[in-house]
Amino acid sequence: MRTPLKIVLVGLPGSGKTTFGKALAKQLNFAFIDLDQVIEQETGNTISQIFEQEGEGRFRELESIYLKKVLEGIEGFILSTGGGTPCFNDNMELINEKGVSVYLDVSLEEIIRRLGKDAFGKRPMFTNLGDGEAILKLKNLLAARENYYMQAKIKLSGDDISTEQLLSELMVFFRN
């Protein structure tokens, strides 16, 4: 009998953590958990409201609290994290200790295509930024965060990452 895993997806905003995570969870018959949704449900505020009213520092604190809570909970889930989650409060260390981290390494061009004009405006980090500023911000985020993402146990690269690719990589983590 295999032990269910805690699979934690990391990567830039727009890398497909939620979309990919839902598909993978369905394929593995695991629960899908979106960390931002957990934070919103637990606090009663949207991520944007937390950023606006309490600042990024408080958001990162809440993010760490709920990340720890999720990772110490049930087994057999796929967790989609926020793009910055691994980069604060030793979160990547915790993720690697409690689960199998997977970095979705998607090109900036593909992320920009996926996010498009409308999606940039819906994300707190990109609020009130023009297209050029949003693209520059994304490039700066990658430069600042890639060191954390590269600590993931599995790295999947490409603009069309499949669940089959990850399942192949995950086989080593399924234990008898």
For each predicted feature, which ranges?
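ATP-binding Walker
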Residues: 15
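NTP-dependent small-molecule kinase module
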Residues: 2-3, 27, 143-176
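A glycine- and Lys/Arg-enriched "phosphate-lid" helix/loop adjacent to the NTP-binding pocket
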Residues: 98-144
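P-loop (Walker A) phosphate-binding loop of NTP-binding proteins
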Residues: 12
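Hydrophobic anchor at the beta1->P-loop junction of P-loop NTPases
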Residues: 9
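Walker A/P-loop
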Residues: 18
